[in-house]
Amino acid sequence: MMKRNILAVIVPALLVAGTANAAEIYNKDGNKVDLYGKAVGLHYFSKGNGENSYGGNGDMTYARLGFKGETQINSDLTGYGQWEYNFQGNNSEGADAQTGNKTRLAFAGLKYADVGSFDYGRNYGVVYDALGYTDMLPEFGGDTAYSDDFFVGRVGGVATYRNSNFFGLVDGLNFAVQYLGKNERDTARRSNGDGVGGSISYEYEGFGIVGAYGAADRTNLQEAQPLGNGKKAEQWATGLKYDANNIYLAANYGETRNATPITNKFTNTSGFANKTQDVLLVAQYQFDFGLRPSIAYTKSKAKDVEGIGDVDLVNYFEVGATYYFNKNMSTYVDYIINQIDSDNKLGVGSDDTVAVGIVYQF
């Protein structure tokens, strides 16, 4: 019974913070370094070769490694940094050995008492403060939180100010302001101009509410794409959650303008949706003996796509479950029941996908 009760406490912490189970490797004279990581044996199952499916088919094994460090400069001022890297384990040792390997996070900053923290580097965009509420599925999810896409996911060149508990005056009231520097890359998909975003959230006794918004200039290369118009990209999202008594419920609604990447597989043209409307729902329950079932629904619809009109980008129901043997070892299955029509005008895959994984994390 004691083991079951411990799992009921530890598992939600692991889901919210990927470093909650980190191994402390140094702690001396006000300097602390924690190492964290995981190895995931993972396989996707879809019809045929998976080209017309939600998630593909075959081996998807990967590992991640990261560290978090902090140094106590004085009684009020603390320095900190974090780095995280992804290693694909489904590559050969030949020419494709480095395919998919990437830096996920790399930033450093300072925190001063109740005034807040300021950091710079590769970090999460502030709109993910809202989208993170529903990015909780065993394997899938987070479909609208694209990386290197302005403010909705991990992105480079962001300066972020965060304040917790409103200068120490209101417990649970948090806000953030973020500046996104210009990233003019070789591909329009992962480029962006200068922009500013912000978020505000309030949490009380398991309930949470959040709103976030970001707007940025688009690069010349993005404006030249055949799909998507406008000089500005905008993204916003709201979220509600309940996280208490072993229950997790969350919902997001958001919209984007000239910001969500799309590709027409029939014409081989790419660009951005002029507008999207996104709905994400998730419900989970943590049993004391380690089982955590999950159900979810996600729909992202593009509006006014050139030559097409309105079209679904993502549309599915999810059923899955994770079983935690202890705080370090788990296994899961995640099933996407795809609701995309077989005649989708962008050629988005309409077949289902099942993921089966086993995880060691520390």
Curated annotation (Swiss-Prot):
Q: Write the signal peptide boundaries.
A: 1-22
Periplasmic topological intervals: 29, 74-75, 114-115, 164-171, 205, 245, 288-289, 326-327
What triggers expression?
Answer: By growth in low osmolarity conditions (low sugar or salt); activated at low osmolarity by OmpR, repressed at high osmolarity by OmpR (at protein level). Levels of OmpF protein decrease in a lon/ycgE double disruption (at protein level).
Annotated effect of mutating E139G? In strain: B/r; AA sequence
Keyword Nucleus attributed:
no
Q: CDD domains, from UniProt?
A: gram_neg_porins
Q: What happens when the gene is disrupted?
A: Leads to decreased susceptibility to a number of hydrophilic antibiotics including ampicillin, cefoxitin and tetracycline. Deletion of ompF confers resistance to colicin E5.
Result of altering Q88E? In strain: B/r; AA sequence
The protein's topology relative to the membrane is: Multi-pass membrane protein
Sequence ranges on the Extracellular membrane side: 46-60, 89-104, 123-156, 182-193, 218-232, 258-274, 304-313, 338-352
Q: Which Gene3D superfamilies match?
A: Porin
Describe the family membership recorded for this protein in Swiss-Prot or TrEMBL.
Belongs to the Gram-negative porin family.
Q: What name does this protein carry?
A: Outer membrane porin F
Q: Which organism is it from?
A: Escherichia coli (strain K12)
Q: Which gene name does the record give?
A: ompF
